[in-house]
Regions:
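Alpha-helical repeat scaffolds
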Residues: 80-89, 116-131, 172-181, 206-224, ...
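Extreme N-terminal leader/anchor segments
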Residues: 1-94, 102, 261-267
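Structural motif corresponding to the intra-repeat A-B loop/turn of tetratricopeptide repeats
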Residues: 66, 78, 111-114, 169, ...
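Amphipathic alpha-helical repeat scaffolds of TPR domains
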Residues: 12-19, 48-71, 95-112, 149-165, ...
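Long, ordered, amphipathic alpha-helical scaffolds
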Residues: 45-46, 60, 226-316
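Flexible helix-coil transition and linker loops at the boundaries of alpha-helical arrays
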Residues: 42-50, 88-97, 125-152, 182-186, ...
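Glycine- and acidic-residue-rich phosphate-binding/metal-coordinating active-site segment common to enzymes
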Residues: 181-240, 246
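Short, charge-rich amphipathic alpha-helical segments embedded
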Residues: 75-115, 181-198, 269-277
């Protein structure tokens, strides 16, 4: 459901090393050796400025998305955030075409969410055009391998950030349009924008039937995380929390209080400590790189969904 910056850094550096030494992509032992090198010490794999820029981003993500939000000491957190910002500035200078670096730096330095949204909107077509050029210009097997997945991800993260931040700013139609744009480009939805789309549709007061049609139209990523079930009622238990919240909101608006209570009961039973999470609705830190990694069906996933769904829940 989310992107792994360390895994991407490893993939990128290993692919570049194979290319430099003209090692076939099918050479399993060499790939394994390079991956072990990355785990031990990635420094020998970092040759070009773009390599270092990508590696810096992975380090920044570890800090700003997974460590700093949970540091209790404000002074230490501010120091680490300043260090992360400096690393992003270095990454952006080393590789001006690295859209992750540009976007994350703006996310950290923008004066407001609205300013960040405007930046994302203003550059979105440029990011898409740059990606199209990279895909079209891929010549060797290594470039084509990257073009099939790796170099597409910054664009998907861009659209996911736009969808998420537009939702926060109350621009629900813009949020839904960005999510649909991402789903059209990548139907497997590695960015998880379908969840943001569900919340935007709830705020736009789509009826419950429209929400179900949306899930059906984008069934591939939903099925990837859903166990096979024989009975429809059993399948309801596997609905993700974003869908359950959106359906609960739709039922409430339609004065279907029994239906709203039904989805609430499923939420309460969805994971350990669900009732506590629903009661406190703790704010979950918004990922700067992308939606943070949480386990499917976990309490953390529910807390994350509740945090993102704050605009929806405020009206229930």
């Amino acid at each position: 459901m989310a992107f792994d910056p360390i895994q991407e850094d490893c993939h990128r550096l290993v692919l570049e090393a194979l290319r430099r030494d003209n090692i076939p992509l099918t050479d399993g032992p060499s790939v394994e050796r390079l991956m072990e090198q990355f785990t031990r010490n990635p420094a020998p794999l970092i040759v070009h400025d773009r390599d270092r820029a990508g590696h810096l981003i992975a380090k920044v993500v570890e800090a700003v998305d997974y460590r700093i939000p949970f540091i209790p000491d404000d002074t230490q957190a501010e120091q680490e955030e300043a260090a992360a910002e400096n690393m992003l500035r270095e990454a952006a200078a080393l590789d001006p075409a690295n859209w992750d670096a540009q976007r994350m730096l703006t996310a950290l330095t923008a004066e407001s969410n609205e300013e960040y949204v405007q930046y994302l909107v203003s550059k979105c077509d440029e990011v898409e055009h740059d990606l199209a050029l990279k895909i079209a210009s891929a010549q060797d097997p290594y470039e084509r391998e990257a073009a099939g997945d790796l170099i597409r991800r910054p664009y998907l993260r861009w659209l996911a950030a736009l969808a998420s931040r537009a939702l926060i700013s109350g621009r629900y139609r813009m949020s839904l349009e960005a999510a649909n744009r991402s789903l059209d480009f990548a139907p497997n939805d590695p960015a998880g924008v379908r969840h943001t789309a569900m919340l935007a549709m709830a705020k736009l007061e789509y009826p419950a039937e429209e929400l179900r049609r949306f899930r059906s139209a984008h069934s591939v990523p939903y099925l990837a995380n859903t166990p096979l079930r024989r009975r429809p009622k059993d399948a309801e238990r596997d609905l993700d929390p974003w869908t359950l919240i959106a359906l609960m909101s739709a039922a409430w608006r339609e004065l279907d209080y029994e239906g709203a209570e039904h989805y609430l009961r499923i939420l309460v039973r969805s994971c350990p400590h669900a009732a506590e999470a629903l009661y406190f609705q703790t704010e979950f830190p918004d990922g700067v790189y992308a939606r943070v990694n949480v386990g499917v069906g976990s309490t953390d996933e529910l807390v994350l969904a509740l945090s993102e769904a704050a605009p929806v829940l405020s009206l229930i």
